From Swiss-Prot:
The gene is rpl30. SUPFAM superfamilies: Ribosomal protein L30p/L7e. GO terms for biological process: maturation of LSU-rRNA from tricistronic rRNA transcript (SSU-rRNA, 5.8S rRNA, LSU-rRNA); translation. Disulfide bonds: none annotated. PANTHER family: 60S RIBOSOMAL PROTEIN L7, LARGE RIBOSOMAL SUBUNIT PROTEIN UL30. Belongs to the universal ribosomal protein uL30 family. Keywords: Ribonucleoprotein, Ribosomal protein. Part of the 50S ribosomal subunit. GO terms for molecular function: RNA binding; structural constituent of ribosome. This is Large ribosomal subunit protein uL30. NCBIfam families: PRK06049.1, uL30_arch.
Length: 162
């Protein structure tokens, strides 16, 4: 069962090198505070994360945070909120039952990939974190900043950004 990476763009569009900008477009991170979810074993993902590590932060998302994220920020085509009824109606053909909790469980178990579902938007638009960033947005997480790999502590940041 692969981990599920939550990837958030922290820095804006100014002074981004063309190769990094292209990588961010491939990840669907077009704007600041946009977030995507990919399985950690996705081919080519690790190289893309390393290429864009000075503009993004990422880590493993847990079940509770994923359910809360899907409830508050999940959108369907037509920019309508993601609901339990919608999941039961449109995703039953993928074997997903139990509403948003069932969708979150299927994502974490690797049964489906969010970016492959055509009826749910793969990008989550988040708010800036409540209370602001605790550290510099120009330094790596391990060096006292907010960028790069942060492991399980991504969940605290996501909850502040919902």
């Amino acid at each position: 069962m692969p981990d599920l990476y939550a990837i958030i763009r922290i820095r804006g569009r100014l002074d981004v090198p063309p190769d990094v900008d292209y990588t961010l477009k491939l990840l669907r991170l077009h704007k600041k505070f946009h977030m995507v979810i990919y399985p950690s074993n996705q081919p080519g993902l690790k190289g893309m994360l390393q290429k864009a590590k000075d503009w993004i932060t990422w880590g493993e998302i847990n079940y509770e945070t994923l359910v809360e994220l899907l409830r508050k920020r999940g959108r369907t085509l037509g920019n309508k909120p993601l609901t339990d009824e919608f999941v039961d109606k449109y995703l039953s053909k993928y074997g997903i039952y139990g509403g948003i909790q069932g969708l979150a469980k299927a994502l974490l178990e690797g049964k489906i990939k969010l970016h492959k579902l055509e009826v749910i938007k793969p990008v989550f638009r988040l708010h800036p974190p409540r209370g602001g960033f605790k550290r510099s947005t120009k330094r790596p997480f391990n060096d006292g900043g907010e960028l790069g790999y942060r492991g399980k502590s991504i969940n605290e940041l996501i909850k502040r950004m919902l």
